[in-house]
Amino acid sequence: MTGLVLLYSGVFVAFWACLLVVGICYTIFDLGFRFDVAWFLTETSPFMWSNLGIGLAISLSVVGAAWGIYITGSSIIGGGVKAPRIKTKNLVSIIFCEAVAIYGIIMAIVISNMAEPFSATDPKAIGHRNYHAGYSMFGAGLTVGLSNLFCGVCVGIVGSGAALADAQNPSLFVKILIVEIFGSAIGLFGVIVAILQTSRVKMGD
């Protein structure tokens, strides 16, 4: 563990030292104009941003679902050794975790249907509408992906507690299940916000 901490600390220090040296050199030699965020945003294609949003929506949602299933499943299997009756009933927690991935897939399909081809290649000809659409799709994908990531972890931890509590006292299952339902609503909040972000998106010529 100490070796990993030293490795990560060394990488962290080296990264910031390199960044500091480059920044000082660019400042001394008056080359600061090369750090141009506006140039990067206008020279990249709106399709890149929309596809990044689609990829983030699916990948982060699947990571959240897998993480939640891992946390819940290990507790169900461990508690099922002592109390085999909990194995079937606590599969509800697995279903809640899997729903998180479904939210991401649905939102990725919605975003991909909004992407329309356009013929322009010059940044001025592409227009603000297409850039706005690309950035909005990226933001929507990031929103739903991160919310589903944390939703999956939340549902997994609560589901793990529900399985262990049910193994000890069956009357606690329904009470903890209510907490799990509220935890799974976090993913729905992300989907709703992502839909609002892309509600006025128009792409194409």
From Swiss-Prot:
GO cellular component, one term: membrane
Subcellular localization(s) per the UniProt record: Cytoplasmic vesicle, Clathrin-coated vesicle membrane
Organism: Bos taurus
Pfam family, any one: ATP-synt_C
Transmembrane regions listed in the UniProt entry: 4-24, 52-72, 91-111, 138-158, 176-196
Predominant subcellular localization, coarse grouping: membrane
Superkingdom per UniProt: Eukaryota
Protein task: Proton-conducting pore forming subunit of the V0 complex of vacuolar(H+)-ATPase (V-ATPase), a multisubunit enzyme composed of a peripheral complex (V1) that hydrolyzes ATP and a membrane integral complex (V0) that translocates protons. V-ATPase is responsible for acidifying and maintaining the pH of intracellular compartments and in some cell types, is targeted to the plasma membrane, where it is responsible for acidifying the extracellular environment.
Keywords: Cytoplasmic vesicle, Hydrogen ion transport, Ion transport, Membrane, Transmembrane, Transmembrane helix, Transport
Site feature (Essential for proton translocation) residues: 98
Protein name as annotated: V-type proton ATPase 21 kDa proteolipid subunit c''
Lumenal side: 1-3, 73-90, 159-175
Family: Belongs to the V-ATPase proteolipid subunit family.
